[in-house]
Structure formats: C-alpha cells, structure tokens
From Swiss-Prot:
Mg(2+) binds at residues 78, 120-121, 439. Functions in the biosynthesis of branched-chain amino acids. Catalyzes the dehydration of (2R,3R)-2,3-dihydroxy-3-methylpentanoate (2,3-dihydroxy-3-methylvalerate) into 2-oxo-3-methylpentanoate (2-oxo-3-methylvalerate) and of (2R)-2,3-dihydroxy-3-methylbutanoate (2,3-dihydroxyisovalerate) into 2-oxo-3-methylbutanoate (2-oxoisovalerate), the penultimate precursor to L-isoleucine and L-valine, respectively. Pathway: Amino-acid biosynthesis; L-isoleucine biosynthesis; L-isoleucine from 2-oxobutanoate: step 3/4; Amino-acid biosynthesis; L-valine biosynthesis; L-valine from pyruvate: step 3/4. Belongs to the IlvD/Edd family. Signal peptide: none annotated. The gene is ilvD. [2Fe-2S] cluster binds at residues 119, 191. Keywords: 2Fe-2S, Amino-acid biosynthesis, Branched-chain amino acid biosynthesis, Iron, Iron-sulfur, Lyase, Magnesium, Metal-binding. One of its GO terms (molecular function) is magnesium ion binding. InterPro entries: Dihydro-acid_dehy_C, DihydroxyA_deHydtase, DiOHA_6PGluconate_deHydtase_CS, ILV_EDD_C, ILV_EDD_N, IlvD/EDD_N. This is Dihydroxy-acid dehydratase. GO terms for cellular component: cytosol.
Length: 547
C-alpha cells in the first residue's frame, strides 16, 4: 500500500508516533489509509452540511476496514461572490482546490481518496485532483437545494437575482422583495436549478465518478447520507482491488458527459470545466467536439432557469439513470466507480413522481442545450445556453453598447440606458483581463427583471448557470490579448445566429485592422494569487486551465 511509506519499517518510528498522536492504533497501521477531502464551511449554503456527509463517509470507510483522515478544502459561494471583486477569485479557486488536494494526498501517502463537495468550482477542482493523482477515489456531491414557493410559484435563487430588476421596474414592492429574499434559498444544498453546481454534480455521476443518484438526491435527504456511507465503503473496495479513476474514465466517458450536458441543457461553465478535467487525464476536449455532440443530441429536459422545474423534480423523474435509460443510444456503455456500467445503472432507474423527461424521439429541441458560436467577434469560439433562449431570439441583430466593466454595464442597464434592440458588450472580463473570468449574472438578471425581451449580452467573461436569454460568453480571443471584442464600438451592428453558429460584428477586415492599429492593451495592477494566475492562465477555449 502507498501508506506503507509512512507507517512501515524501523525508520518510520517517528511517523508512527505522530500517527498514534491522532489516535491510530497498532492494528489500524495495517489498514488502508483513506484521505477525505471535505469542503465544509459555514459561508456556502451548498457546503454547510458537508460535515454530516463527511461523517457518513468516514463511518463507511471504518465499516469496510479502512482508516479515514479528514482534511479541509476551500470553497467559494459564487452567489455571495457575485457582482464585486470577489468574483475574480471564483474560477481561479478551481486550481487551488486541485493543487491543495494533490499536496495533501501526496504528502501523506493516502491509499485512497473521497472528495466531498457541492458547488461550482469546488467539484471541478476535486475531479481534476482525482484524475491527476489517479489513486482509488470516489466523489460525493452534496445534492440540490429543495425549493419553496412565492405567490404559488416555485422560486429559486435566480428569482432573487432578478427581483432587483423587477423592483426597479416597479413590478415588486418592498414586501414582495422581502418575500424573494426570505424564500429563494430556503435550505442547504446547491442552488435549485440547473446552474453550474448541479450541472457539474450530474456530469460527475455521468463520468462514473460518483454513485448512482448521488447528483440529484436532495441535500437534506437521508438517501444522501446513505450514499455517502456507501461511498466510504466503496473506496476501500477500490483500494483492495486497485481500481483507479483512469482505469475506467476515458475519452468515451467525457463524450458521455458532454452528451448529458446537451440532453439537460446544463450551465455554460461546463464548457470550461470538462476540458480542464479531461486535461488531467491527458485528453483534449475541443469546442468543436462540444458543438458536434450538441448538433446530434436532442434536448429532452427543461430545468430552471429554462423552466420552473427544479433539480429535485428531475430526481423524482429518475435522475441520471432515467436520462440514460431514455436516451441510451446516445451514450457509450462505460464502466463507473460503482462497478456497474452506465447501461446497467440505467436499468435501475425508478420514476417516483412526475415525468419531466421527454422522449428523444419527441424532444424539446432537436439539438443540445449548449451551442458554440464562431465568427469575427469570436474567432476561437464563444458559448451560449441555447436551451434558455426564446425561439424569436435565436437570430438577432442589434446595436452595440460597449462597457469595460460589469459595474459600468449594470449601472447603465438599471438607469434605463439599455433599450430593446441593443447588444450589451462587456469586455476585459476574460481569464487574463479581469482576471479570473468573472460571471456576469447581475447584468443579465437586471435585463430579465426589467422585462427587456429584445436585448442580447456578449462578454469575454462567464455567466452563471442561472443566466437565461441571449447571453453569449467565453468570447475568445478575449479583449485583454487583442481579440476583436476589444475593437467593438458603440453603435456597431452585431449579428447573432444560433442555428448557423455565427457571431459577427458588421465590420470589414479593413475596418477591424484600422481599429487594431490604434488599440492599446489595458494595464492592470495585480498582486498575490491573481497576479500569478493572470500570467499562467490559458484561454477560455482551453478551459481556462493553467499552463
């Protein structure tokens, strides 16, 4: 066992003494040592009960004959970090999560690993670490937050973000605003809709790195505790059988994850995270592959922000196993950490409530929920959640209103300076430019809350999974490195054609060249982690991974 390097032999007397200081007994020195990476904290709603899940994991490890060692991992709440400088740290924290898990596991020579997390960047960071380390490992994801109702309607955190615009437009009074504040995040768990956290939990299960139903089992449920305990038992079995993630996660597994992403209309952030995770396995996922799979995969379930259905409703409909069962022909039958293949898991699917999953033969949309756009405004690509765009906005031409910061754009929107027919352009928000590629949820929520139906938004930054409407992100090359988005001016005409996958500014090559000759990069004073990150980060089309 790997852990023998810290517990066996005469020259490890001091090591054993330190382990005994923790309460490790002589007989436990012969058992597998299992690291349990716990992202519990009391600032992230999706993480505030991970201590209980981690306890269940450790009980499972003990029951199966292993010795668990828990260690802490950071976790940022994207919702609380939204709309201020803190959002610049969200995406970069993914790499910190991966690196710190790697450091802890390698330093202490754990035989196996369980990662416990719920939210946006923490899950991808943990999966990156699992594949990088390639020791027996399993993921336990915290599960979705249940919803409450306001005015008889289901509400989610998306509604709270949009409430500010509704209030500004006179659609809500003070009492109504308070209701949204009090009931849009009523429980523990990852925010209710198919935003980034729940999208990544579903893709983790599809990749085969968590047990069946782990992703959609609600945060407060006893089923979640049982899955956590089973995961603790399973990791010990994986150690005994020497089954490592890269023994079953391969290119076809990632194709399955992209397919699932398209079937459900997941967050556009998955287009950043999956390539970064795959890179740790030596696999390259191009934007072209995402678009190729999107074109051949139907969209069969509509979940908030695209509808009023929530992830707990998907769980009642059978979760990931039922999605695979209904859309079996679109998936490769790959092995999973459970010891069962995807097809075998699909046969376990149980419908417990309403069925919100359409048949692939009669889908909601013939193509997948995410589209990759290219053109002179995004030569390396841009991303849009097509599943959350109304039919009449699939093709749109509008007038550019250009802003070099989120705050500037948000103020203009709330002050009524953005009108129907406009295309809001927010630039210098990319991986290097911001840096950290912050999410632009507040401007998009303001547009929705104000009831603006014919306004698009384009950025080299990102969007929250809660964003809906014609919002195009990840524009690459970004403004900070001289991408054409840096050359757009107020009044330019911008054309969006989602079916044709086109994103164009109506300027000739000569006009762009003339503007480029006058362009100068913006200098930004950076310090600490973000200064290092800005130097090392790659473009959005490469998952904003570090060199």
């Amino acid at each position: 066992m790997r852990s023998d390097e810290v517990k066996k032999g005469i020259d490890r007397v001091a090591h054993r003494a330190l382990l005994k200081a923790l309460g490790v007994t002589d007989d436990e020195m012969d058992k597998p040592f299992i690291g349990v990476a716990n992202a519990y904290n009391t600032i992230v709603p999706g993480h505030m009960t991970l201590d209980k899940l981690t306890q269940a994991v450790k009980e499972g490890v003990y029951a199966a004959g292993g010795v668990p060692f828990e260690f802490g991992i950071i976790g940022i709440c994207d919702g609380i970090a939204m709309g201020h400088e803190g959002m610049c740290f969200s995406l970069p924290s993914r790499e910190l999560v991966a690196d710190t898990i790697e450091a802890m596991v390698e330093a202490h020579r754990f035989d196996g690993l369980v990662v416990v997390a719920s939210c946006d960047k923490i899950i991808p960071g943990m999966l990156m670490a699992m594949l990088r380390l390639n020791i027996p490992a399993i993921a336990v994801t915290g599960g979705p937050m249940p919803y409450e109702r306001v005015g008889g309607e289901k509400v989610s955190i998306k509604d709270a973000f949009e409430a500010a615009g509704m209030y500004k437009a006179g659609k809500l009074d003070d009492a109504g605003l308070k209701l949204y504040e009090d009931y849009c995040a009523p429980y523990c768990g990852s925010c209710q809709g198919l935003y980034t956290a729940n999208s990544m939990q579903i893709l983790t299960e599809t990749l085969g790195l968590s047990l069946p139903y782990c992703s959609t089992s609600p945060c407060p449920s006893s089923r979640k505790l049982r899955i956590a305990k089973q995961s603790g038992k399973r990791v010990v079995e994986l150690v005994m059988q020497n089954i490592k993630p890269l023994d079953f996660v391969n290119e076809r597994s990632f194709e399955n994850a992209i397919t699932m992403d398209m079937l459900v209309g997941g967050s556009t952030n998955t287009v950043l995270h999956l390539p970064a995770i795959a890179k740790e396995a030596g696999i390259r996922l191009s934007l072209d592959l995402f678009d190729e799979i999107s074109r051949r995969t139907p969209h069969i379930v509509s979940i908030d922000p695209a509808s009023k259905e929530m992830v707990v409703d998907l769980d009642e409909s059978g979760g990931v196993p039922m999605l695979i069962k209904k859309a079996r022909k679109y998936f490769h039958d790959e092995m999973t950490v459970s010891g069962k293949t995807l097809y075998e898991i699909a046969e376990m699917a149980v419908l417990r409530g309403r069925d919100i999953i359409a048949s692939p033969d009669n889908p909601l949309h013939k193509e997948g929920g995410i589209a990759i756009l290219k053109g002179n405004l995004a030569e390396n690509g841009a991303v849009i959640k097509a599943a959350a765009v109304s039919e009449d906005m699939m093709r749109f031409e509008g007038t550019a209103k250009v802003y070099d910061s989120e705050k500037e754009a948000l103020n203009a929107i709330l002050d009524g300076k953005v009108e129907e027919g406009d295309v809001v352009v927010i630039r210098y928000m990319g991986p290097k430019g911001a840096p950290g590629m912050p999410e632009m949820l507040l401007p998009t929520a303001a547009i929705s809350g104000l009831g603006l139906q014919k306004v698009a938004l384009i950025t080299d930054g990102r969007f929250s999974g809660a964003t809906r409407g014609p919002c195009i992100g990840h524009v690459s090359p970004e403004a900070a490195v001289g991408g054409n988005i840096a050359l757009v001016e107020d009044g330019d005409k911008i054309s969006i054609d989602i079916p044709a996958r086109k994103l164009e500014v109506k300027l000739s090559d000569e006009e762009l060249a003339e503007r480029r000759a006058k362009w100068k990069p913006k200098e930004k004073e950076l310090k600490g982690y973000l200064a290092k990150y800005a130097k090392l980060v790659r473009g959005a089309e490469e998952g904003a991974a570090l060199l």
